[in-house]
């Protein structure tokens, strides 16, 4: 679901059965990913490099993250990532354990 149109994903390290998967994302202006809920015992961490992204957790908590902001949450919570602006956003995301 996170490979929707308008999102470019680049792995930052070769995937070799690591416990953590870091990648760089570029999200087009106005793009919104489908809401997902991953298996229990998973975590995600986001750090915004440029632009603004919006992360909604469990439909009732919305966080607007700008350059230099970070967020960490359990992937078992329903979550959605969006770029609500007219500018491209870039950010680093880490997932543990990895899931592509």
Please annotate each region the language model reported:
Residues 7, 75-100:
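Ligand-binding loop in jelly-roll beta-barrel domains
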């Amino acid at each position: 679901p996170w490979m929707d149109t308008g999102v470019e994903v680049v792995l930052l390290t070769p995937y070799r059965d690591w416990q953590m998967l870091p990648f760089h994302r570029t999200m087009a202006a106005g793009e919104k990913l489908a809401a997902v809920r991953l298996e229990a015992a998973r975590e995600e961490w986001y750090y915004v490099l440029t632009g603004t992204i919006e992360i909604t957790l469990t439909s009732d908590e919305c966080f607007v993250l700008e350059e230099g902001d970070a967020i960490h949450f359990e992937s078992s919570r329903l979550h959605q990532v969006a770029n609500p602006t007219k500018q491209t956003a870039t950010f680093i995301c880490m997932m543990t354990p990895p899931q592509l």
